[in-house]
Structure formats: C-alpha cells, structure tokens
Design a protein with these regions (language model features):
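A cross-family structural signal marking well-folded subdomains
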Residues: 1-58
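Intrinsically disordered, low-complexity linker/terminal regions across diverse proteins
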Residues: 33, 37-368
Length: 368
C-alpha cells in the first residue's frame, strides 16, 4: 500500500541538483498558475497589458473576418458545408490575454484557501497539489457551464506561456498574455505582427476546420461539420500537403511523417493564407502606410514574411530531431516555414522567386 502511494504521488527524483530545482519550479508554477499569471501581468504593467489585449482583440476580429470572407472561395466546399463552417466560426469564443480575477488578491486567497504547503516536505506538497487539483475538478461538475468565460482555462499554467491553442470540445480559442510580446507581437511595424502573431491566431482558427476539427460542430459536439462530399473533397485536397511534407528530409534517411503532422500542417497553410489576406486588407484600408524598420530596405510584404519566419529560427541536435519526428505532431521548425511559403503565390511575388524554383514550384498545394 505504501509503495502504491509513493509510486502515485512521488515522481522519479532527478539525480542532478539543477534538474531538481527545475522540477520544483515547474510544479510550483503549475500549482499556483493564477498567481504566476498575476505576477507576470504586474511586472509588464496592468495598464499596458490591457491596452495590448485590446489591440489583439481587434486583430483576432480581423483574422476571423478574413477567414469568413475566404470560405465562399473554396471550390471543394458545398453550400451546406459552407453554411455549417460559417456558423461554427460565428460561435467560436475568443479568450484573449488573461482572466481579470487573477489580479484580485481576495479571489486568489479564497481560491487557494485549501492548499496547505510545507516548505520542508516535498512529498506532502505533491499530495496536496494532486488533492487540490482533483477537488477543483470535482467542483466544476456542480457549476453552471458558461462557454464564454475563462473557467476551463484560468487555472492552467500556460496562460503566461507562449502557447496559443484551440479547444475542439468547446470551440474556444485561447490567446494567452505570454504571447503578446516580440518576436510574435510587435507594436510596429504591423507587417511583423501580422506575419508572426497574426499567423498564429489564424493557425488556431484553422484548427476548427482541419482534419480533426471537422468532426465537431459549432458547440464542440462530436457531430461531423461537413457533408460527405465535402469531406471527401477536403481529404483529397489534404493529400497534396501530406505528400509534400512526406518528401521533406530532416536528416539522411529521416523524413517528416506527413500523416502524423497533417493537422498542424493544414493549420499552418491556412494560417498563412488568412494572415496574408488580413494584412493585404489592412494595408489597403490604411493607404498602404505601415512603419518601416531602420537600415533595412524591405517592402511591407517582405517584412510580413520575415515576421512569419522569425519565431521559427532554431538550431537542434540530430538526436532531438529524431525524437521530434517520432513524438511531435508538428513538423520541424524549418519545414513549418518552407512548406507553407512554397505554396504561397504572394510569397513568390514578394521575393521574386523564379517559377519552378524550390520556393515557387509550378504545382502548389491549395486547401484554403
């Protein structure tokens, strides 16, 4: 019995002191996620954070509007499926930034009233954390569900992290406060922001309509969104993306799995297409006026694509890449840039890529 208790509540202890500190820090952040979020917001400035959230809220509306106006242009979508997709987009809830409750000290004290922490007893704290989390989960069964609030996400540790996500089961997109900073979100120029942050938002919107998203309706209920003909046409169009990524060689003899990464690749392609449309419309409505970066001679469109590529700059070891290919549903960073851009006529035009070149192939994949 004691062994079962230890196995359930006492994780493997890292032998290295630095690793132990990292684990303790991570578990503390997970336990006190609302507190960490509040600390992060106050460090950035509450007023400044609110202003950025307002700007992001407007940008999300621009992205959703671009997606909405692009839907009727999809040749593979029937009239019935078009109506269903528009309805799902209309019902999508956006949670931007952070829940205001985390800045209320009284609320925080009440929320953590049951959590008794002992600075000298790690095992006791692990048990407390598991018990506390389970208690909160049980309480949710007796609460009235409101899809428009942060209830399902406010206590998660990644609100202050750089990670937007879409929840299929509730049709909710979360854009946490941690994302609202460079190299994703820039005050100016807007080209960089639309290219980096705008594509992330559009990527998450597209998840509502990828190979998994089409299995759920506007309320997040397991109910196929499209009719059978549209689903067949969608999968036919998706085959091009599947084959494209399956040809990408990460290391000698090691290729991207076009099946495992399909959903994310579809979202990447859709995100780029929608962000391109949104920035083009924004430029047009602002008389093609946008800020420029000093000392570099790039057009607005070129900066847009540089903004897209910038967050994916990374160097990985061969061993990490082999692990990534097996365990991650995302393509490696490099191919999340090259794949979508090679299918973009606007990119080829902006950078004058010759027809038939690697970044401007004559045959391009087109889903969105």
């Amino acid at each position: 019995m004691i062994w079962r208790l230890l196995a359930a509540f006492y994780p493997d202890r890292p032998p290295d002191e630095i690793q132990r500190k990292e684990r303790c820090l991570k578990e503390t952040e997970d336990m006190f996620a609302p507190v960490v979020t509040a600390m992060y917001i106050r460090d950035k400035g509450v007023e400044a954070s609110e202003q950025i959230v307002q700007q992001v809220d407007m940008m999300v509306d621009i992205m959703k509007d671009a997606f909405k106006h692009n839907l009727p242009k999809l040749s593979w979508m029937s009239a019935f499926s078009l109506s269903a997709a528009q309805e799902k987009l209309e019902h999508m809830v956006d949670l931007i930034g952070y829940p205001k409750s985390v800045l209320n000290s009284t609320w925080l004290d009440t929320f953590f009233a049951r959590a008794e922490i002992d600075a000298t007893d790690y095992l006791s704290n692990v048990v407390t954390q598991r018990s506390f989390s389970r208690h909160k989960e049980i309480l949710q069964f007796f609460e009235t569900y409101n899809r428009g609030l942060w209830n399902d996400f406010a206590h998660m540790p990644d609100i202050a992290y750089v990670n937007a996500y879409y929840n299929q089961l509730s049709n909710i997109m979360v854009v946490p406060i941690g994302m609202l900073q460079p190299p994703l979100f820039w005050v100016k120029p807007k080209s960089l922001t639309f290219g980096a942050f705008g594509i992330v938002v559009a990527h998450e919107i597209t998840h509502a309509f990828d190979d998994e998203g089409i299995l759920y309706d506007q309320y997040g209920t397991f109910n196929p969104l499209y009719d059978n003909k549209t689903i067949d046409e969608f999968h036919l169009a998706s085959n091009c993306v599947r084959n494209q990524y399956s040809d990408f060689e990460v290391l000698t003899g090691v290729r991207v799995d076009g099946n495992i990464t399909l959903g994310e690749n579809i979202a990447d392609h859709g995100g780029l297409k929608i962000a391109e449309i949104a920035y083009h419309e924004w430029l047009k409505s602002n008389g093609r006026s946008d800020s420029q970066l000093p000392a570099v001679d790039f057009t607005h469109e070129q900066l847009f694509y540089l903004g897209y590529a910038l967050p994916w700059c990374a160097v990985h070891s061969d061993n990490m890449m082999r692990t990534h290919i097996v365990k991650d549903e995302h393509a490696p960073d490099k191919f999340r840039v090259l794949g979508p851009l090679a299918n973009s006529p606007r990119f080829s035009e902006a950078w004058n890529c010759p027809i038939g070149s690697v970044m401007n192939p004559e045959s391009k994949c087109k889903i969105w």
